[in-house]
Each structure stands twice: as C-alpha cells, then as structure tokens.
Amino acid sequence: DPSFSQLCDAMAAKNADEAFRAAHTLKGVSKNLSLTGLAYSTSNLTEALRGKTELTDDIDPLFKKVKKDYALTMACIQML
C-alpha cells in the first residue's frame, strides 16, 4: 500500500489536503489489518488534518508518532 509514502510526500510538500487523504487511507488499512498502534496514531493525525488548508504546528508531533509506529509495525512484520 503506497499510503505511507504518499503521506510522507504530502507532508514534505506541506500539502494538507493530500496529507489528510493519505493519512485517512493509512488509518483504514491499519484498522482493517488490526494494526492497533498504527491505527491509533493515524487516526489522531487524520483528525488533526481534517478540514485544514495548511499544516499547523500541532501536526508535526502527530506525524512523527505515525512514522515511529509505521517503522515499528514494519519491523514486526519483517520478523515474521
């Protein structure tokens, strides 16, 4: 699923609308796969981005948490 890389690209481009879409997609994928930690952090990021036209200061810590949870999730999957 390309949604994490799309989220990273959107955040780098400071595109709040694209970041919202990518975070929302990643949230859905995470929930469908029962990846609870990642689903929780992406849900928080999605709600913070909802309706935003630009990225605000509160977004960066939430995005950092998503990146951390994504890395942890991928590491766990690779151990299987």
Where are these regions (language model features)?
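Amphipathic, coiled-coil-like alpha-helical segments
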Residues: 29-80
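Residue-level signal for cytosolic alpha-helical hairpin/rod architecture
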Residues: 1-5, 23, 42, 59
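Generic hydrophobic segment detector
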Residues: 1-14, 74-80
